[in-house]
């Protein structure tokens, strides 16, 4: 008993020192990387307020989305390096939902890991992660659920789309616009690192949520992308939702317009600490839906040249599509909606109750409408072949270059590159794939009195 009490006190004191030390070090540190037309301060999500996207803190930092008052969906690689049963017992964890999450997390630490709804911070009492994520770490099957020990009744929840997006127009179709690519406008958000497009995620984490826009670049697999870009797959057939980060000036030497579309005014990309955050199909810019929908959870980012830095122009981000894991999410969602059957019965009799459809589950019906529902067929999960999908993948440097080429993912046919102007200063045979997860935070310096960690 004495040993467990001492360990608990040590954990608490260490956690408080770490949190307050980081707060002292986090001046001008920033999440989500904007293009060079915006600053990291300008994309702080002040207008979003407490919107159901929160920061996850355990041994590192990730982002997650509240899907009911007791459940958050996020990325498995944020937690799958330990047994799921460790969380909520020997490893404290929490989600905080304020735009500036630091006051809530400090309060959670200082009060023995206690939820505080007034500060929108909630202790985690259980975590479940997809075992399929263990095979590749963060590349496939990267989905997890966390339950909160106190209902987050004062925090909005999000609807989840469990159907694949309809295949959009592609090259050769009347009305296809390569500047818009798939035509699906998405929002990205998270609490991770920030920076600027030309330099990548040069700023650390400051516990604030940031947001940016992008176009959905493709639904395809890392195998299919790799086959086109450098002539070989890597045993990763599962489809992913992908976005790229376009240079609005089309002058960056590493920007190959990897998923065909042009830069948006407030375009951005993801960085370390944004893992688990939502890919949002927003109602304002998409005729498909009258409400914002979560399409996927962030797993990581890619760069394509050794001299290129992560989270900079020309890179991309990849998300786990929720429609591939609808059965896993529904089976492991700890929050149930129930109602009584007709007729008299005892309150304690389980046969007098029925499970109801979760009001935040969405599908696209046969008429093309987004409705409350659940898929009739089981999804493929990590077994998805990657042969189906959509979007256009490109090796398209700025300028009219002999080696530029694109491929229509849905047909497998060549597609015309869309860029012109500018100068190509590197060659396509330098392309190589580098992937990184986007969890974690900044490593701590050695503890001193001055930095508050001693």
Regions found by a protein language model. Give the residues of each.
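A conserved glycine-rich beta-strand in the N-terminal activation segment of trypsin-fold
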Residues: 52-69, 137-138
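Chymotrypsin/trypsin-fold serine protease catalytic domain
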Residues: 140-143, 149-267
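N-terminal secretory signal peptides that target proteins for export/translocation
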Residues: 1-8
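C-terminal segment of classical bacterial N-terminal signal peptides
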Residues: 19-28
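Sec-dependent N-terminal signal peptides
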Residues: 8-18
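C-terminal subregion of chymotrypsin/trypsin-like serine protease catalytic domains
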Residues: 30-45, 63-102, 204-213, 218-223, ...
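Solvent-exposed adhesion/ligand-recognition segments of exported proteins
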Residues: 335-454
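Conserved H-D interstitial segment of serine endopeptidase catalytic domains
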Residues: 32-35, 81-137, 154, 330
